[in-house]
A protein has these predicted regions:
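N-terminal organellar transit peptides
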Residues: 1-221
C-alpha cells in the first residue's frame, strides 16, 4: 500500500500524474463551467509534460488512464506523437468513450485496454472556414483532405495487426477501402469494446483472462 503526502495527492488531482506509480490521468482540463473542452492545448501541454517527466525518471512502463472526448486535431496529434516517441512502454486504459480525437490517441500506446462499456467513435471531424478568402479556403480544404487520409492510415496500420485482417486475408489497401466505406456510410462509426478489439483498434478488454484487473496492467514489463 502506498502512502501519499499532500503534494503527491495534489499532483494527481491538479496535474494528472502519479509520479510514484508512473500513472497519468488524461482528461479534459478542468474548468469552472459544465462544458467539457476535451482534447485541447491545455490538456495536451500537461500531458506532454507528464510523459516527458516520467521518461526522464526511468524507462519503466507508464500507465495512462484516458477519460476524454474528442477535440482539437492538431493538439491530438501532438499527444499522439508524444506517446509514440516515449522511451518507456505505454499502456492505456480507456474509460467510457474514445471518440473522435481520443479514438486516435487510443492507437498510439504499446498496449491498449478498454473498460467493458467503452464505445469507440471514429469520424472525419469538421473544419471551420468562416470569412476565409477563397484561396485560403481552398488551401484549408486541401489540408483537411490530407489529414483525413492520415487519420485513416493510423487506423489501417492498427487494423492490419488484427485477427480480423488475418482471417480475411486483407492487404493494406483492402483494409483501407473497408474503413473508408464504413466512414462514408455511417458518418459516425460507433463500435463496442468487443468490435474495437476485433478491428485491432484496441488490444483487449479489462476483465479478460489476460488482464483481469487494473493491477494486472501494472505487472506489464
Amino acid at each position: 500500500m502506498n502512502n501519499y503526502n499532500d503534494s503527491e495527492i495534489a499532483a494527481i488531482h491538479n496535474y494528472g500524474v502519479d509520479i510514484k506509480n508512473r500513472e497519468i490521468f488524461l482528461h479534459s482540463y478542468l474548468v469552472d463551467n459544465d462544458e467539457e473542452p476535451g482534447v485541447d492545448y491545455k490538456s495536451a501541454i500537461i500531458f506532454e509534460k507528464n510523459i516527458r517527466h516520467l521518461n526522464l525518471i526511468s524507462s519503466d512502463p507508464i500507465l495512462i488512464h484516458m477519460h476524454i472526448p474528442g477535440g482539437d486535431w492538431e493538439d491530438c496529434l501532438g499527444m499522439y506523437d508524444t506517446i509514440k516517441f516515449s522511451k518507456a512502454k505505454t499502456i492505456m486504459l480507456t474509460y467510457a468513450k474514445a471518440q473522435s480525437a481520443s479514438s486516435i490517441l487510443l492507437q498510439a500506446p504499446n498496449i491498449r485496454i478498454l473498460m467493458p462499456n467503452v464505445n469507440v467513435l471514429i469520424h472525419y471531424g469538421s473544419i471551420s472556414m468562416d470569412s476565409e478568402h477563397s484561396k485560403a479556403a481552398t488551401a484549408t480544404v486541401q489540408w483537411n483532405e490530407k489529414e483525413c487520409d492520415k487519420m485513416v492510415d493510423i487506423f489501417v496500420d492498427r487494423c492490419m495487426q488484427s485477427q480480423m485482417a488475418k482471417e480475411k486475408n486483407w492487404k493494406k489497401m483492402m483494409a483501407k477501402k473497408h474503413i473508408m466505406s464504413q466512414l462514408a456510410n455511417k458518418c459516425d462509426w460507433i463500435l463496442t469494446a468487443e468490435e474495437a478489439v476485433s478491428y485491432g483498434f484496441a488490444d483487449d478488454i479489462l476483465g479478460s483472462k489476460k488482464y483481469p484487473s487494473i493491477d494486472s496492467l501494472k505487472k506489464i514489463k
